[in-house]
Design a protein with these regions (language model features):
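Catalytic cores of alpha/beta
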Residues: 66-69, 243-253, 287, 293-311, ...
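Bateman/CBS regulatory modules and CBS-like beta-alpha motifs in cytosolic regions of diverse proteins
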Residues: 27-50, 57-59, 88-128, 133-136, ...
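Surface-exposed amphipathic alpha-helices with a cationic face
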Residues: 45-47, 72, 97, 120-124, ...
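Short beta-strand/loop segments at the ligand-binding rim of alpha/beta enzyme cores
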Residues: 47-56, 102-107, 227-236, 278-293, ...
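Catalytic beta/alpha-barrel core
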Residues: 79-84, 108-110, 130-132, 175-176, ...
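Alpha/beta catalytic cores of nucleotide-metabolism and tRNA/nucleoside-modifying enzymes
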Residues: 1-21, 108-111, 176-177, 183-187, ...
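Active-site-adjacent beta->alpha loops and helix N-cap segments on the catalytic face
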Residues: 84-94, 140, 155-160, 205-225, ...
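Glycine-rich phosphate-binding active-site loops on the catalytic face of alpha/beta enzymes
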Residues: 73-88, 255-267, 307-325, 361-395
Length: 502
């Protein structure tokens, strides 16, 4: 006989947080949003943590390299979409990883015997004004000088001059050994009023550059999420078909964390994928899995070896899985159930597996509700699709700007692998739509605003960290009438009155 859940399936919109006691310490400036991204054992630190509880969805219309960089600057992680060729996805990951400043391997190098024309051509090709001059013209050759735009004046030169005649020679450069830390390098740059600092090894070979502009950028983005080499943390999506070829390419490209992109994670296909990763990489490659909506699904993926588990089926704004197939669960109910299973699993095994709430976030206050219900972080699609940094076109419709946004199960994305249950036969119907979302400006401005609301609400609950919020939060179901009561009501708002007068 079929199993029936006793409780009605609820969404975030049906809940409110009841305020708790707030001490004088409970101010937004004191709130920390740091949260684990991957599993860890009791008493240990997670291998990767987020500085903000946000990751971007594995979607063509959301997670490109530009958004990956922008989100990492704010402290989150973008999962580059996997519904593209292996080579294209790996290249996108590599470009995002290599964007970051810090210790940068030089990609603009030239020999002393090259000419000014060669310098100009190299600058036009790479877009960089700082060019390393090495004996053999390689990125790790013996450094003999540097050429910048200050070293030559095109209008007064023929173009045939050798680089050695106008470069700044090594003896006039300030350099640092390869044992120098990033902080020490930045101090040297500051003290000597430099724009760049070459880092050389004991043999005088060039290892890296450290640039002033990257120090300035870090000051503007104190929460930026970096790996051990001071590069941005970047994620990537994989599927349950070509993982044996895709994963090695993504690891080689520098992906810090992977995630199986599937609408339904309670399947043998996901456990096979996770088993392959553990067999070939052990715990060195971090892989999230999902999506599931109940305790049983969570435990299945936990035992299969998932590093984090995504919750949600059919709750995304462009997802029509519930409509076409009749499967899913209200996001709030699913999240509460799975997080309870997560906590019990932690008590029993001593292993904490982070839970990601994927879908159903419509308003900013839904973010706080999801975190209070137990989510460690949120995967957002529509939210990020609205921004300048998403990879879609911005278009004007009747004077209003929109961004294109389509689901991975739509005909446009043709990412049937996400919705396949395996086997050779491909699905032939859509589970996502092609749509528009209102254009909202830059990622930084919007994320700052959204998280300021999250922090403010956490203070209302007397919490300064996400775990503290989950411990102290008091949630109540609301009726349809109280939902209406919660907004502006029984007044004529001024903008409406202005429209009526026209």
């Amino acid at each position: 006989m079929a199993y029936y859940f006793n409780e009605v399936s609820h969404t975030f919109n049906e809940y409110l947080l009841v305020p708790g006691y707030s001490s004088s310490e409970c101010i937004p400036a004191n709130v920390s949003l740091k949260t684990p991204l991957v599993k860890y054992k009791k008493g240990e630190e997670p291998a990767i943590s987020l500085n903000i509880p946000m990751v971007s969805a594995i979607m063509q219309s959301v997670s490109g390299e530009r958004l990956a960089v922008a989100l990492a600057k704010e402290g989150g992680v973008s999962f580059i979409f996997g519904s593209q060729s292996i080579g294209d996805e790996a290249a996108m990951v590599a470009r995002a990883k290599n964007f970051k400043a810090g210790f940068v391997v030089s990609d603009s190098n030239i020999t002393p015997d090259a000419t000014l024309n060669d310098v100009i051509a190299l600058k036009e090709r790479n877009g960089h004004s700082t060019i390393a001059v090495t004996e053999d013209g390689s990125a790790n050759g013996r450094l003999v000088g540097i050429v910048t735009s200050r070293d030559y004046r095109v209008s007064r030169m023929t173009g045939d001059e050798k680089v050695s005649s106008f470069m700044t020679p090594l003896e006039k450069l300030v350099t640092a050994p390869d044992t120098t830390t990033l902080k020490e390098a930045n101090d040297i740059i500051w003290d000597n009023k430099l724009n760049s600092l070459p880092i050389v090894d004991s043999e005088g070979k060039l290892r890296y550059f450290v640039f002033r502009k990257d120090y300035d950028a870090h000051k503007d983005n104190p929460n930026e999420l970096l790996d051990a080499d001071k590069r941005y943390v970047v994620g990537a999506g994989i599927n349950t078909r070509d993982y044996a070829e895709r994963i090695p390419a993504l690891v080689e490209a520098g992906a810090d964390v992977l995630c199986i992109d599937s609408s339904e994670g309670f399947s043998e296909w996901q456990s096979r994928t996770l088993a392959w990763v553990r067999e070939h990489y052990g715990d060195s490659v971090k892989v999230g899995a999902g999506n599931v909506v109940d305790r049983e699904g969570f435990l299945f993926l936990a035992e299969a070896g998932a590093d984090f588990i995504k919750v949600g089926i059919g709750g995304g704004s462009i997802c029509i899985t519930r409509e076409t197939k009749g499967i899913g669960r209200g996001q709030a109910s699913a999240l509460i159930d799975v997080c309870k299973a997560r906590d019990e699993y932690f008590e029993r095994t001593g292993v904490y597996i982070p839970v990601c709430s994927d879908g159903g976030i419509v308003y900013d206050h839904h973010m706080t509700l999801a975190l209070a219900m137990g989510a460690d972080f949120l995967m957002l699609g529509r939210y990020f699709a609205r921004f300048d940094e998403s990879p879609t076109n911005k278009i004007s419709i009747k004077g209003t700007y929109y961004k294109e946004y389509w689901g991975e199960g739509s005909n446009r994305a043709r990412n049937w692998q996400r919705y396949d249950l395996g086997g050779d036969k491909k699905l032939s119907f859509e589970e996502g739509v092609d749509s528009y979302v209102p254009y909202a400006g830059s990622l930084k401005d919007n994320v700052t605003l959204s998280l300021s609301k999250v922090k403010s609400t956490m203070c209302n609950c007397g919490a300064l960290t996400i775990p503290e919020l989950q411990q102290k939060a008091k949630l109540t179901l609301v009726s349809a009438t109280s939902i209406v009561e919660g907004g502006a009501h029984d007044v004529v708002q001024k903008e409406t009155y202005s429209d009526l007068k026209k």
